Amino acid sequence: GSTDMAIGNAIGSVTANTGMIMAISLIFLPVAIRMSQFAVKGVLMVVSTLVLWLLCRDGVLSLPESMIVLALFVLFIIENIRSAKKLSAEEHTDGAAVVDKSRKALLKNLALFVLGAACLVVGSNLLVDNGTVLAQLLGVSERIIAVTMVAIGTSLPELVTAITAIVKKQSSMSVGNILGANIIDITIILPLCALISGDGLHIAEQSVQQTVYLDMPMCALVAAIAVIPTILHKRFTKLQGILLLALYIAYVFVTVRI
């Protein structure tokens, strides 16, 4: 159905997560990072945005192209498993408490996962349906609603995590959460939409120019600004946060004006 809503929401969420929420974290709190973990996931985020942009330049994410993007998700899962094993080994070395592996704990976490997934499906349907109606009422394209209001709405969990991290002074928690959410948005949500449709994901003709030449490049740009200087200098800076936030505000302004 709402192709513009799906694409705009995924791309807009990544841009909002990085340009607004990560920016706020960097401005208000010095962020300590595990460079070995950040570098791989950060590069994967940048590569994912660039690959998606290149594949969609003709206005279509075809089924074979969807498989290429999904392959990046597989790499993300492999990296998560690798880093989790390494972290677990370090914790055992430090004498940390072992995670409760009882059947009761497993069932509890499984139930919470299913409940969370169900709420996510219901919430996503409400966002898309009401976003479409809102676009019609305001007389604007679904893309504009998707990359601004819907994207910010779906980024609220990351915003809550960022605020909690700032209050508790646990900055790395916020950054790690944002990286993971961004990679998932790009590498699984859009490819799955393309596969479910049966013939790929087609950007609406009236939105191709803005999506391919504004939304996706901006998404790649904020990802690059968040990642590349950090890897080169081995730390985040407040200047990065200010630049990211300024770019995001400018992007939203341009988006609603064109």
Label the predicted regions:
Residues 1-258:
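Hydrophobic alpha-helical segments, chiefly the membrane-spanning helices
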